[in-house]
Structure formats: structure tokens, C-alpha cells
């Protein structure tokens, strides 16, 4: 049994043309018989949400804060890299990883032309602008230390 009515969701595009409007000569395709999809709106595009929900406001307020003001970093030499006298140091959570690299270069007395490669948990080399507190929060070990391996030649990753 063929029906002359199109099934819901299978309507073909038809052109809408307004004879009274001279500017409507270029008609745009319109899908008739289709409901508009329920697309999620961002909070900034929503006309219903005038303010953020309390949970979102609290989460955003705490996003840049850290549980500890300073975090412990444990340095581990890899390969022929010299060992440090103090393998653990405390660094402010808000500092960038560049601060850790500068400290290690200064402590090892590395020339400006020489390279030092740093890896978190012997897996990846973080970007210099990465925040130490974020690295610690995501990759600390069971003793609440961030393990940073260092080498004079590329080792991991």
C-alpha cells in the first residue's frame, strides 16, 4: 500500500518561493515535515540560563586553585645524566614547568648550548608552559610526589 503522504523524517526538500517578494528569487531548500533536532545549547547561547548554576559556578571558582601551595618533585637521572645531591625539591603549584627546567639546568650547571630532557613518570615531556600544580594533580605517585626523570640525551617518548 503506497501512501501519498511522506513518512515522518523522509520528506524531500522543496523550494519555498514567495511571489509577493521580489528578493525571494533564490529560494532556499526547506525540509517540510521534519522536526528540528534537539541540539544542546551552550550556556552562553541559552536564553533560559541567565546565570550559571551553583555547581558550575563553584567548579569554575575552584578550577585554578590547588590543594597544596607547594608540591614535591623527585628528580631521577636517566642514562649518563649526573645525579643531584638533593633529589627532592618543593616547587610552588602555580609555577610553570619552565621553572623546573631552569632550576635543573642551574643545579646541573649545564651550558646554554647543551640540552636537558625532562620527562614526567618516564613517559612524556610536558610543555614548558604547563602548570606544575596541574601536572602534580594528574600524575603524582602514591607518596604524593611528581616524578621527573632527566637525561642529557632523548630517552623516552
From Swiss-Prot:
Gene3D superfamilies given in the database record: Phosphatidylinositol 3-kinase Catalytic Subunit, Chain A, domain 1 (3.10.20.90)
Any GO molecular function: protein tag activity
GO terms (BP aspect): autophagosome assembly; autophagosome maturation; autophagy of mitochondrion; glycophagy; piecemeal microautophagy of the nucleus; protein transport
Main function: Ubiquitin-like protein involved in cytoplasm to vacuole transport (Cvt), autophagy vesicles formation, mitophagy, and nucleophagy. Conjugation with apg-4/atg5 through a ubiquitin-like conjugating system involving also apg-5/atg7 as an E1-like activating enzyme and atg10 as an E2-like conjugating enzyme, is essential for its function. The atg12-apg-4/atg5 conjugate functions as an E3-like enzyme which is required for lipidation of apg-6/atg8 and apg-6/atg8 association to the vesicle membranes.
Protein name per the record: Ubiquitin-like protein atg12
Keywords, comma-separated and alphabetical: Autophagy, Isopeptide bond, Membrane, Protein transport, Transport, Ubl conjugation pathway
Subunit record text: Forms a conjugate with apg-4/atg5.
Biased composition, class Polar residues, residue ranges: 1-13
Any Gene Ontology CC annotation: autophagosome membrane
Family indicated by similarity: Belongs to the ATG12 family.
Annotated localization: Preautophagosomal structure membrane
Main location: membrane
Ranges for region Disordered: 1-38
Membrane topology: Peripheral membrane protein
Cross-link (Glycyl lysine isopeptide (Gly-Lys) (interchain with K-263 in ATG5)) at residue(s): 157
CDD domains xrefs: Ubl_ATG12
Pfam families for the chain: APG12
Amino acid at each position: 500500500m503506497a501512501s501519498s503522504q511522506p513518512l515522518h523524517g523522509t520528506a524531500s526538500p522543496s523550494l519555498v518561493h514567495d511571489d509577493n517578494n521580489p528578493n525571494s528569487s533564490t529560494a532556499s531548500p526547506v525540509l517540510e515535515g521534519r522536526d528540528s533536532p534537539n541540539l544542546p545549547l551552550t550556556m552562553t547561547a541559552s536564553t533560559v540560563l541567565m546565570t550559571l548554576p551553583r555547581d558550575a559556578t563553584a567548579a569554575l571558582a575552584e578550577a585554578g586553585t590547588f590543594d597544596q601551595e607547594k608540591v614535591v618533585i623527585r628528580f631521577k637521572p636517566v642514562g649518563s645524566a649526573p645525579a643531584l645531591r638533593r633529589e627532592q625539591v618543593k616547587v610552588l603549584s602555580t609555577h610553570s614547568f619552565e621553572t623546573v627546567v631552569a632550576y635543573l639546568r642551574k643545579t646541573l650547571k649545564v651550558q646554554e648550548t647543551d640540552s636537558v630532557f625532562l620527562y614526567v613518570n618516564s613517559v612524556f615531556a610536558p610543555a614548558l608552559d604547563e602548570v606544575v600544580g596541574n601536572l602534580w594533580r594528574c600524575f603524582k605517585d602514591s607518596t604524593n610526589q611528581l616524578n621527573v626523570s632527566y637525561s642529557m640525551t632523548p630517552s623516552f617518548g
